[in-house]
């Protein structure tokens, strides 16, 4: 069982900065803005060759005007405390001891969890003076760190992991045993290298988790959908746009298949974005789309397909990600409104006709289970291995049905096709003058390959490669007769 470490504290004390340092990532959004982190963010860390799970949480504090959101954030933090084996109580050395710190310490004493007091932001300060007040919390030794620079982090984590590291028995080996052990270790390293090299070529998509990004405009029900699938209060859900600010990665096993769900912040028009933090959130969402295998676009049934939904779809298509479209809150609209929404989808999403559309209620769960079949179908299609002979045969059938257009009076020749990559699926076609083929014929070939290969939910890209002329850079060697004829011609021209 991998030990779990939870980072707890007031808002803006540096929990997310510390989380990023421990996980050696930039997964947690960081800014000088209280209440930026709202959901539980999970990450993997390796400390002294031992694996741990780190949980970043929203701050615990009473802020006037946002009590309801704050209540949900506090609940998320308390859930993290219950999950954790060790709690790191992060404090702000510059701000000193505040009433909220006393309340958190009181709660931690009741839970009787292994707790470490960590005073952050001690850079540029006298650590002895800065840490004195925090001993009054009666939770043991206070560790001073600077998470942004890494000062004191190694000493802290060495103390944290001590209970989880088994003591190694002292074994004295003879010289012969030492030599045998050395060569066995060398052989293991060689075998490991060979294995890693072969793994690059033998990696089976079925053995990898499906990374699923859930995207959409603010307040369309993305976090509600994640919570229903997980069957727990995992994501902060509230009827205010922008409740989710960061991209949260959540592992899940469903029907013996591994998934990694990525719950993202809502994306709206750039003109409506006022806060710098929201711009960071949008960038993280777009990066989550690029990192995903499949994207689940959530549309609000009450509002229909907006221009912002179309912009998101365009970005997903350009990124080459597989797609499943979900219309949420379907139970909240009338039958007449449902007809209008379906007509709008047919009219405005005609360019994404390869993606399946589901009508669901994330709140009540209707239609949610059917999503997994379409998600797996889209992933399987985008990672399908297709041999060269089949692709070439399909290309020839497409050519027989509809000949390529003329280019400067000459017919384009399509010679053969092969696979050029997966996720997205790329078909490379070789031939003469292929780079001059117009867009309409490219779309025809793309749709023909899609129908023939039964590709659903995944885009197909067609790339053309011009066949090289083997004689393009070579000069013909003249025969003896041609050489004599050339000399006579030159002599004749000189006499004139």
Swiss-Prot record:
One of its GO terms (biological process) is ribosome biogenesis. GTP 2 binds at residues 216-223, 263-267, 328-331. Residues 3-168, 210-383 form the EngA-type G domain. InterPro entries: G_ENGA (IPR031166), GTP-bd (IPR006073), GTPase_Der (IPR016484), KH_dom-like (IPR032859), KH_dom-like_a/b (IPR015946), P-loop_NTPase (IPR027417), Small_GTP-bd (IPR005225). Signal peptide: none annotated. Residues 384-468 form the KH-like domain. GTP 1 binds at residues 9-16, 56-60, 120-123. One of its GO terms (molecular function) is ribosome binding. Keywords: GTP-binding, Nucleotide-binding, Repeat, Ribosome biogenesis. Belongs to the TRAFAC class TrmE-Era-EngA-EngB-Septin-like GTPase superfamily. EngA (Der) GTPase family. Associates with the 50S ribosomal subunit. GTPase that plays an essential role in the late steps of ribosome biogenesis. This is GTPase Der. It comes from Hamiltonella defensa subsp. Acyrthosiphon pisum (strain 5AT).
């Amino acid at each position: 069982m991998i030990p779990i470490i939870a980072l707890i504290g007031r808002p803006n004390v540096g929990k997310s900065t510390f989380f990023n340092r421990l996980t050696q990532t930039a997964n947690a959004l960081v800014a000088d803005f209280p209440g930026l982190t709202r959901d539980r963010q999970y990450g993997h860390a390796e400390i002294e060759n031992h694996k741990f799970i780190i949980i970043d949480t929203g701050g615990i504090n009473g802020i006037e005007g946002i009590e309801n959101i704050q209540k949900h954030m506090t609940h998320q933090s308390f859930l993290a405390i219950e999950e954790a084996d060790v709690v790191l109580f992060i404090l702000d050395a510059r701000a000193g001891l505040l009433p909220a710190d006393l309340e958190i310490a009181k709660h931690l004493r009741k839970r009787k969890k292994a707790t470490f007091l960590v005073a952050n932001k001690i850079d540029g300060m006298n650590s002895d003076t800065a840490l004195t007040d925090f001993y009054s919390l009666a939770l043991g030794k206070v560790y001073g760190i600077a998470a942004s620079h890494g000062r004191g982090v190694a000493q802290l984590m060495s103390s944290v992991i001590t209970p989880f590291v088994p003591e190694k028995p002292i074994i004295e080996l003879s010289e012969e045993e030492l030599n045998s052990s050395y060569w066995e270790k060398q052989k293991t390293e060689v075998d490991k290298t060979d294995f890693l090299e072969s793994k690059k070529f033998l990696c089976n998509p079925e053995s990898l988790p499906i990374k699923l990004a859930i995207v959409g405009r603010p307040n369309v029900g993305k976090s509600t959908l994640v919570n229903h699938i997980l069957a727990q209060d995992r994501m902060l859900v509230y009827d205010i746009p922008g409740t989710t600010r960061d991209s949260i990665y959540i592992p899940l096993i469903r029907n013996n298949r591994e998934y990694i769900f990525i719950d993202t912040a809502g994306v709206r028009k750039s003109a409506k974005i006022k806060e710098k933090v929201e711009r960071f959130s949008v960038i993280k969402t777009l990066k989550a789309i690029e990192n995903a295998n499949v994207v689940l676009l959530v549309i609000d049934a009450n509002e229909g397909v907006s221009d912002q939904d179309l912009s998101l779809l365009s970005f997903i298509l350009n990124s080459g990600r597989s797609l499943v479209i979900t219309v949420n809150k379907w139970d909240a609209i009338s039958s007449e409104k449902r007809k209008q929404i379906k007509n709008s989808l047919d009219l405005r999403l005609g360019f994404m006709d390869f993606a399946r559309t589901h009508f669901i209620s994330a709140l009540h769960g209707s239609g949610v289970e059917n999503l997994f079949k379409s998600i797996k179908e889209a992933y399987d299609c985008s990672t399908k291995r297709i041999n060269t002979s089949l692709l070439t045969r399909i290309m020839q059938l497409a050519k027989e049905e509809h000949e390529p257009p003329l280019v400067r009076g000459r017919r384009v020749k399509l010679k053969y096709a092969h696979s050029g990559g997966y996720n997205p699926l790329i078909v490379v076609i070789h031939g003469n003058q292929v780079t001059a083929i117009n867009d309409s014929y490219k779309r025809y070939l793309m749709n023909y390959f899609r129908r023939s290969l039964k590709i659903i939910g995944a885009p197909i890209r067609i790339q053309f490669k011009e066949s090289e002329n083997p004689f393009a850079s070579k000069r013909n060697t003249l025969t003896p007769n041609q050489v004599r004829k050339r000399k006579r011609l030159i002599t004749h021209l000189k006499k004139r």
